Amino acid sequence: MSKKTIFAILLILSVLIIIRPKEETLLRCAMFGPMKLFSSDTCMAYFNVFGYSENVYQDLRENFDVASLLSLSPERKYYFAQLYLDNGNDINKKIDQGMPIHSAILKDDLEEFYWLLEKNADPSVVDHLTDLDAYDFIDIMIIKQPTPNRLEMHKVLERYKPSS
């Protein structure tokens, strides 16, 4: 790393320490974008250097869920969703905006779908918005709006489906 880069990082961290924004503010900056003085990357640098306090984990637990974190920008969504799960939060917890696996199916996001299954999302959990599990939901989505991604999701879910 060049001396200029090291100096810039130290300067940014010094300003962060001097003005001391709350960690919750820095978390939102890192997740959603810039705040008055700092870019999202600068806020991420703070956490990369100092780590996450219990306040940050509590903020994540109380104000976010996997589905909302997976709606962040592509470069941040898996990072924060994993941080949420690493703190012991349940990927299969029923939430107001629906189950994350249903959201991935609806968004036609194959990468997110695979990520959720890898993290033990349970396709048999019934989503309270649709009153369907992921198996039935994918069947309906294929009828209403078939896509190559949804056809792939259907194949994958057929392998997960418990035999009757």
Q: Could you describe each region identified by the protein language model?
A:
Residues 24-72, 93-103, 126-142:
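Ankyrin-repeat boundary/"N-cap" motif
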Residues 49-54, 80-91, 114-123, 153-163:
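Ankyrin repeat domain, specifically the short helix-to-loop turn at the C-terminus of the second helix
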